Amino acid sequence: FLSFVSNTRVSSKWAAVPWARVMAMVTPMRVRVEGRENIETGQSDVLVSNHQSQYDIFLLYGWLGVDFKWVMKQELRSVPGIGIACEALGHIFIDRSNHQAALATLESAKAKIVDGTSVIFFPEGTRSRDGKLKRFKKGAFRMALDLDLPILPITVTGTRDVLPAGTSDLLPGSAKLIIHPPVSVEGISAEACQRLMDETREVIASSLPAKLRSAG
């Protein structure tokens, strides 16, 4: 895993992606992907996904087919195995308790989002305990506006049934990854960030069951 540290794109393709697929296979978790045609080859995007389970990570890593950097909470850096692997892959840790430090980290991370490498956010900030789509935070949308990059909304379903909240029980099941058409930020001012965020949330919610679309 760490021998690929000098090239994080190669590391992701040849270590992280197979790892995610093997984890899904042994669960087992069947995966279906819709909307792959909405991914433009060579385009860097700000990827925005709902967050239902720890298994979202395997689903996105294993089946999205995009080179990306995660934006993740600083606390994960100290988790044995996970922290050092994510650092080797060039992922982005932010200190959510320090707003200015978080902004500075995102600012320095911009250099990584080039040449088809994207950045992915869970804008709810944490997993939804009840499956309902939570309110979004603005970080992903501010970065998209600042870098003038399209937002690629993604809906994840089924993973919370494979690994339910509050347990370590893995259950055989099915998951779906829905990739929506990109949302352009062209002509959108920073003052309209809230509207951009609300519109993106509506797109992601549209592929969830009606009972899970309201803020949990």
Regions found by a protein language model. Name each.
Residues 1-17, 24-27, 40-99:
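Catalytic core of membrane glycerolipid acyltransferases/transacylases, capturing the structured
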Residues 19, 56-59, 72, 81, ...:
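Hydrophobic alpha-helical segments typical of transmembrane helices
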Residues 23-24, 86, 112, 144:
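A generic structural signal for well-ordered alpha-helical segments
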Residues 27-29, 33-35:
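Membrane-helix interfacial anchor on the cytosolic side
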Residues 33, 47, 70-71, 177-179:
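Generic preference for hydrophobic
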Residues 36-41, 169-170:
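A short beta-turn/loop motif at secondary-structure boundaries
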Residues 37, 99, 157:
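Residue-level "edge-of-site" marker
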Residues 103-216:
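Non-catalytic C-terminal accessory region of glycerolipid acyltransferases
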